Amino acid sequence: MRRNKTTYSLLQTILVACLLTVTPTFASNKPTTDESGTISHTICDGEAAELSCPAGKVISIVLGNYGRFSVAVCLPDNDIVPSNINCQNHKTKSILEKKCNGDSMCYFTVDKKTFTEDPCPNTPKYLEVKYNCVVPATTTTTTTTTSTTTTDSSLIVDEEEEAQKDALNSDVIKPVKKKEDVFCSATNRRGVNWQNTKSGTTSSAPCPEGSSGKQLWACTEEGQWLTEFPNSAGCESNWISSRNSVLSGVISSEDVSGLPEFLRNLGSETRRPMVGGDLPKVLHLLEKTVNVIAEESWAYQHLPLSNKGAVEVMNYMLRNQEIWGSWDVTKRKEFASRFILAAEKAMVASAKGMMTSAESNVIVQPAITVEISHKIKMSSQPTDYILFPSAALWNGQNVDNVNIPRDAILKINKDETQVFFSSFDNLGAQMTPSDVTVAIAGTDQTEVRKRRVVSRIVGASLIENGKERRVENLTQPVRITFYHKESSVRHLSNPTCVWWNHHELKWKPSGCKLSYHNKTMTSCDCTHLTHFAVLMDVRGHDLNEIDQTLLTLLTYVGCIISIICLLLTFFAYLIFSRNGGDRVFIHENLCLSLAIAEITFLAGITRTEDSLQCGIIAVALMYMFLSALTWMLLEGYHIHRMLTEVFPSDPRRFTYLLVGYIPPAIITLVAYLYNSDGFGTPDHCWLSTQNNFIWFFAGPACFIFCANSLVLVKTLCTVYQHTSGGYLPCRHDVDSGRSIRNWVKGSLALASLLGVTWIFGLFWVEDSRSIVMAYVFTISNSLQGLFIFLFHVVFAEKMRKDVGHWMYRRGCGGSSNSSPNHKRHNVQRDLMSPGVNSSTGSDFLYNTNDKYLTNSDTTNRLVYNGIMNHPNQMSVYQQHPHHQIYEQQPGTYDYATIAYGDMMPGHRVAAPPAYQRLAVAEGRYGSQHQLYQGWHHRPPPEFSPPPPPLSTGPPNSRHYGTGSSGRRPPSSKMSDDSAYSDGSSSMLTTEVTPQGQTVLRIDLNKPSMYCQDL
C-alpha cells in the first residue's frame, strides 16, 4: 500500500512536469467573446483589469474566480511549480458585481487588496472573469455558478447554495447594517471638473481642451482615486488627424524635405500637454516615418535631419509620464518595445548614408542617446575590446557603456562592421518585470518577490552594409556597465543582469551574469548582443493597512495635542512673562512656528488633488519647519550666551527675528528654483525624495541638530562648573541632590527643545521602510509640543513664580513665596533686575536644608530686611574674632563673604565661614526665637572681577583700630555683573581689611535686591 502511494506521488509529479513542458505558460490574454456574446478575460495578479462595453450598454458579471486553478496560466517562471493549484476566493463574483455591474467601463487592479483576502499566499494568482454587455433598462438573470475555463483543474462553487446553508445554520438572523457610502472627493485636472464619485465606481468626463473623446477615473473602495491622473486612453488630440494627413501627402509626393519638416512639427506638438490616446497614434506616425527612411531611397538625402527629428519626438514621449499611465502594464511594455525598435531601425538605416569610414552619427537627448559608429578596422585595434559610445572615451562623467569583444566583430566582417549603441532613460518604468516566485530555502513553500528596473535600458548591435547582424554564443562576453544613483538602489537587493525579449515582452536572465555591483555601478557579462538592464528585488515590505491606519491616527492625535500645548505655551509666555527678555521672545517664536507648521500639516498634507495647491502647501510646510528648527538653534545659542557672557548685553530681538525667518526663506526659495516639481508628491503634499531633493530640508536639519548637540554639551559643561567647580567654602553636600535633579531636568528640557526627536526623522529618510523608525518618529515628532509645554511651563519653577506674581499684582492671591510670618517687599524690576537679563544673578541663589534660630543678637548672623535698626558696628566687630575694628562708611552695612585669596594682594588668612541670609519677622514678634530657612550664594565664577573705576571724589579718612597696618582705601562699587551682583544692584561695595581680606558692604539706602524671589 505504501509503495502504491509513493508510485502515485511520483506519477503525479511527472504529470505536472510534463504539463509544464508541453503546455505554454501564458500571461494575461485578450478578451474573447463566445457565440452568446459573453466576454471572457484572464488577468494576472498585479496587473490592471479593464472591463468595457460598447456605448449604450453596461456590464453584467456572470463569473468571477480569483486564485489559481492551472499550472500553465500567469506563471512567471516555468521552472517553478506552484505549491497550490486549487485555490479560489469565494467572494470574487460578489466583489466584481458591486464594483462593475451597471457601468460601461470598469478599472481595477488584480490583487489581494481588491478581493479583500489571499486564498493561497506565496502562490501566483490570476483572475478569470466573464461578463455580458446588456442594455441598462433590461433586467437580467445571471447564473450563480462560477467555474474556471481551463481543463487542468476546475472548481465549482454555488454561491447561492452556500448562502442558503449559512442561513439554515444560523439560529438568529442578524440585521445587516448598511455600510456608509464613501466618495472620492471632487477635483479639477487640466481644466476638467470631476464630481464626487462613489467608491467602487468609475466616473467619466469630457477630455481636456484641445482633444476629443471621453476619459475615465476609477474610485477605489477606500474612497481614493485609483491612479494619479484620469485615464485618457479614450481621448485623442485634435492635431493627430491633421498630422497623419500631412505625412501621407509627403510620402505620396516623395517630398525630400517634407520628412524633416514633418518631424520638426510633430516634435512641437508633442511638447504640449497630451492625452493617453495620443501615445499609440504618435508611435504609429513614427513607425510610418521610420519605414520610409529605411526603405525608400528618395529619403536618404536628409537622413541625419530625419533621424534627429524622430529621436526628439521619442524623447518628448518618454518624458511624459501621464500619457503612459493611461495604459495597463502589458500595453506599456508593448509600446516601449516598439519605441526601442523604431529608434534602432532609424539609426541603422542612416548607416547606408555614411559616406566615409571615419564618419559617425551621434544624437543625444535627455531621455535617449543613440550612436552609429564609423566602420571598424580590426587590424588597427590594439585591444581585445572596443568601448562604446564614444562619449565614454573622452567624457569625464560616468556614462553607461558597452565593451564589445574582438571575437564578435571578427564573426561579421573585420573591416566593414559598424556598431549601433542606444541608451534609454525613463523607459524602465514602463517595462516593469513580473514578480518572481522562488522557493524558500529549507521548506516546501514559495514566496513572491517584486522586482524593479534600476538602470537605463542599454542596447548594442553590429551592422554590416546597413543591416543588423545577429550575434550570440560569444566565447568572450560582452561587458555592459551601468551607472545608477545610490537612491535608486536603496532598499533593494539581489541585482540581476537581464535582456529584453521583444517577442515575449519580458526580461530574461539567460546568457547574462553579474560581474560587479556597488551602490553606483553594476557590470554585466553577456554572450550575445541586444538590449540589457539591471533588475533588483524590493527588500523589506511596505507598511500594511493596519500600520498605515495606526500611524495616521497617531499622527493626527499627536499633532492636535501638540498644537494645543504649543498655543498654551505661547500664551503663557505672552501673559505671564511679558518682560522675560530674549529667551522668552525665542520661546514664543518657536512655539508659534511649530504650531503654524503642524496646523498646515493637518489641514493640507493629503490635498493632492490640485497639484498647484499641493505644491504651495509643501512650500509652506518646508518653510515653517525650517523656521522652527532655526529658532531651536537660536534657543541653544542664547542659553549658551547667558551662561558665558560676563556683562548682560542689549536685547537682540530684531537680530533674532531676522535670523529666525530670513535663512529658511532663502533655502526654500533656492529649492523651488532648483526644482519646483519637487514640491508635492502623488501621495502627500511634501518634498519629493527623487534626485535627493528631500535633502534641501534634511541637510539644514542635520546641521542644526549637530550644532545644537555641541551647544548642549558646552552648556552642560558650563552648568557643571557652576554647580561643582566653585571654591570649597561655597560647596554644600546637603544641596547636591537638588542640584543634580535641577541639572538633569534642565538637560532634558534643553535636549527636547533642541530637536533631538528629529534624528528619528533622519533615520527614517535613510530607511523609509522601517516600521520602527516610522512609529518612533511619528510619536516623538507629533508630541514635541507636549514636551515643550511640560518642560517650560508645567515643570518650570520660573514660570510658577511668574504666575504667582501675576496673580499677586491682580489681587488674586498672595505671592507664591509669602507666608503669615514672613512678608517680603516687592521691588519694581527694571531691565537689570534679577531673572530678566542676568546671567549670574539670582539664578545662582539657592536654598539649603540648614535651619537657624534668630534673636536680637546679630553678631552671629548679619541680617537685613530693609526696616530694622542696626546695632553699633564697633560693638559688633569687637565681638567677632574674624574681623578687625574699623570705621564704616555712612549708610553702609558690612556683609561677610568668602576671601578671594590671590585675587587681591595682601596677607592670606582663614576666611570666616560662609554667612547665611535669614528673613526676620515683623517687630511685633519681639525677640521670639524663629526658625527660618537658610540661603547660600552660588560659588563665584572662576575669573578675576574687573578693576574698579578711578575715584573722582575726595578721599575719606579711615580710623582703623590699633595694630592695623598696610591699610588700603575701600574700592568703589563692584561690577554690575560680578560674582555677587545681580545686574542692577548698587547696594554692594567692597572693602579690604588690614589682613588683605575682601568683604562686601551693603548700602542701606538701596532697595533690598536679595530679599525677593528666594
From Swiss-Prot:
Residues 941-952 have a biased composition (Pro residues). Residues 359-542 form the GAIN-B domain. The keyword Cell membrane applies. The record marks L529, T530 as: Cleavage. Residues 28-555, 606-613, 675-692, 767-770 are extracellular. It comes from the Eukaryota. The gene is lat-1. Has a role in the establishment of anterior-posterior polarity in tissues during embryogenesis. Required for the alignment of the mitotic spindles and division planes. May have a role in cell death events. Required for normal defection and oocyte fertilization. Involved in sperm function. Operates in pharyngeal pumping during feeding. This is Latrophilin-like protein 1. The chain crosses the membrane at residues 556-576, 585-605, 614-634, 654-674, 693-713, 746-766, 771-791. Keywords: Cell membrane, Disulfide bond, G-protein coupled receptor, Glycoprotein, Lectin, Membrane, Receptor, Signal, Transducer, Transmembrane, Transmembrane helix. Glycans are attached at N4, N473, N518. Changing H528A: Abolishes autocatalytic cleavage activity. Expressed in epidermal precursor cells and pharyngeal primordium. In adults expression is seen in pharyngeal muscle cells and nervous system, the nerve ring, the gonad, and the vulva. The GPS region of the GAIN-B domain is required for signaling. It is a multi-pass membrane protein. It is found in: Cell membrane. It comes from Caenorhabditis elegans. GO terms for biological process: anterior/posterior pattern specification; cell surface receptor signaling pathway; embryo development ending in birth or egg hatching; self proteolysis; sexual reproduction. Residues 814-833, 932-994 are annotated as: Disordered. Residues 43-134 form the SUEL-type lectin domain.
